Amino acid sequence: MANVSFLFVVGIAIGCCTAAHAQPVPPPVVGDISVDPKEAAPLEEVRKLIAAGRSKQALAFADEHLAKNPRNAQMRFMRGVILSDMNDNDRARAAFQQLTEDFPELPEPYNNLAVLYAADGQLERARAALELALLARPDYATAHENMGDVYLQMAADAYQRASTLQPTNRAVSNKLALTREMVTKARTPR
């Protein structure tokens, strides 16, 4: 993903199991779609507005641009990221879902959809979205990392259930402690 100028990873599952843990980061340019030179300036304007913390203005600009250019996948992706940054997760989820339907070959919308699912505790849906991201691009390192985070959270949940059922099982207690430690370390901003 050499042409990605920014990376949007909110720390799937363990880094954003609640909205309070979400760490909004400027969005990437969708890697598999080349930028039409006339589209570069509007994308850069949105990036600048996002970087300046002016999400509402960035959203308005993106919406205005998309009214004239509804198939612009990069601007649509950025719109989803802006909505996510604004904690408008229902609309962000809808934006990323529509992108996956219109551009199933792009892994980034699946990844961001997975981030939102994980933030809501929907780990199975997050896992499924990440599988589709990896199907679209098997070498997408961010999706692999996020898949590991989802599996780690799933493991912690399973060990917690096992510990509740068998509170004296030392092996389960040790595994639960290890996964909790890993979850805590993974939440540390990088």
Give each language-model segment a name.
Residues 39, 73-74, 107-108, 141-142, ...:
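Helix-start (N-cap) detector for alpha-helical repeat units in TPR-like alpha-solenoids
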Residues 23-39, 152-190:
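Terminal, low-structured helical/coil segments at or just beyond the last alpha-helical repeat
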